[in-house]
């Protein structure tokens, strides 16, 4: 019995030492998250929310599945380009040259795009409306977006929506799900590293609804500029 008690005591001490070591690693990781958070150009409300979420992570056991979910969420927040913008080149004649060089014809379309850029230049408002390009395959809808990005010197993102039938692909998953991931729009913004890319939603007419939800409704919500933002 004495040998058994000694062995149990020894094993408990080993477990305690391992937990202490894991805790030290967890503290370093949390400190690193806080340091990265201080470099972000976000609002005081967002900074407060971030600190609240980091504190929640601090209280979570590193062996718990919730720890990885919370950590992924915080890493996603840090990966977003908060108030990071590329400088626009709103030179209308340069934009016209770029469009003419890349596309032959399409005069009405190019004229409408140039009008849009001219209004954007006059207003100086980043909240520009969405342009819808429609037509048969192969007429240059997607490549026009690439030319606009090149003319403005903005980052270019193309996101194909063909066959998308799950709302979670647009909006992302709830944090309560194991393996929860952000939606494709958030992922592409992280990839671009800029808050003002030219964002092409390709094949939007091929979005289909099924039992998993209606992605078009999720798109309306995500692309609405009115909700409160941080």
What are these model-predicted stretches?
Residues 1-119, 123:
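Extended, charged alpha-helical coiled-coil/arm scaffolds that mediate oligomerization and mechanical coupling
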Residues 11, 73, 113, 140-142, ...:
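Conserved RecA-like P-loop NTPase ATPase core
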Residues 62-63, 84-86, 120-127, 155, ...:
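Active-site phosphate-binding and catalytic loops of NTP-dependent enzymes
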Residues 127-161, 190-191, 220:
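Walker A/P-loop
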Residues 133-135, 172, 203:
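The Walker A (P-loop) glycine that initiates the GxxxxGKT/S ATP-binding motif of P-loop NTPases
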Residues 159-165, 204:
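A short hydrophobic beta-strand->loop->alpha-helix junction that borders the nucleotide-binding pocket
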Residues 176-201:
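Conserved alpha-helical scaffold flanking the Walker A/P-loop in AAA+ ATPase domains
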Residues 201-230:
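Conserved catalytic/switch belt of AAA+ P-loop NTPases
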